[in-house]
């Protein structure tokens, strides 16, 4: 069974983008390449259990085992040593990527309190979009009673688009609720 969002991309988004930007080939139409979820756990320096819980939550959200990220260099002000585990990240591609994006757009983002749309200023100039989520509780897989601490996470949507405008139209076509 093909994913609902992937079908929407193939049947609706590709023709709309081709018409708007006058692409000569279907392969020139921008597409979502990967989604990277990153959870920085600063308090993992003092308590390693926090990192394990954060990684478990990230695995629940993404459906994939996260990679533990380590500090690249020592920073005395943060009591940080090089090589200490300080976060977790997951890179989603293919079917899981579309499933996550569909869940994010249709279920998770509407659960955010006082939600008026995601900001349009978060594009990086090369067609990639970054979104910060303040609490992991907006995801349906996270059980409220099992959460020991509210943690945020970064979501980076990497597209093949060359400009921010193309990327914005792609994500809008996929249902991303941008603020007016």
Swiss-Prot record:
Keyword Ribonucleoprotein included in the entry's annotation: yes
Keyword rRNA-binding in annotation: yes
Gene3D superfamilies on file: 3.30.1440.10
A Pfam family assignment: Ribosomal_L5_C
Gene Ontology CC terms: ribonucleoprotein complex; ribosome
Keywords attached to this entry: Ribonucleoprotein, Ribosomal protein, RNA-binding, rRNA-binding, tRNA-binding
GO biological process assignments: translation
Molecular functions (GO terms): rRNA binding; structural constituent of ribosome; tRNA binding
InterPro entries linked: Ribosomal_uL5, Ribosomal_uL5_bac-type, Ribosomal_uL5_C, Ribosomal_uL5_CS, Ribosomal_uL5_dom_sf, Ribosomal_uL5_N
Summary of the function given for this chain in its UniProt record: This is one of the proteins that bind and probably mediate the attachment of the 5S RNA into the large ribosomal subunit, where it forms part of the central protuberance. In the 70S ribosome it contacts protein S13 of the 30S subunit (bridge B1b), connecting the 2 subunits; this bridge is implicated in subunit movement. Contacts the P site tRNA; the 5S rRNA and some of its associated proteins might help stabilize positioning of ribosome-bound tRNAs.
NCBIfam families named in the record: PRK00010.1
Similarity comment: Belongs to the universal ribosomal protein uL5 family.
Description of how the protein assembles with itself and partners: Part of the 50S ribosomal subunit; part of the 5S rRNA/L5/L18/L25 subcomplex. Contacts the 5S rRNA and the P site tRNA. Forms a bridge to the 30S subunit in the 70S ribosome.
Entry protein name: Large ribosomal subunit protein uL5
Species: Streptococcus equi subsp. zooepidemicus (strain MGCS10565)
Gene transcribed to yield this protein: rplE
């Amino acid at each position: 069974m093909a994913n609902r969002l992937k079908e929407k991309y193939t049947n609706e988004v590709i023709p709309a983008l081709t018409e708007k930007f006058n692409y000569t080939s279907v392969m020139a139409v921008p597409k979502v390449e990967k989604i990277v979820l990153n959870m920085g756990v600063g308090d993992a320096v003092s308590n390693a259990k926090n990192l394990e819980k954060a990684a478990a939550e990230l695995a629940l959200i993404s459906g994939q085992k996260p990679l533990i990220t380590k500090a690249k260099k020592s920073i005395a002000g943060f009591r940080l040593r090089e090589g200490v585990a300080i976060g977790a990240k997951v890179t989603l591609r293919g079917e899981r990527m579309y499933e996550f994006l569909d869940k994010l757009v249709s279920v998770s983002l509407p659960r955010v309190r006082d939600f008026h749309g995601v900001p349009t200023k978060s594009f990086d100039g090369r067609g990639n979009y970054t979104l910060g989520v303040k609490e992991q509780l907006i995801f349906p897989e996270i059980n409220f009673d099992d959460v020991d601490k509210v943690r945020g996470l970064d979501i980076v949507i990497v597209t093949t688009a060359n400009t921010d405008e193309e990327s914005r139209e792609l994500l809008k076509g996929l249902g991303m609720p941008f603020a007016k």
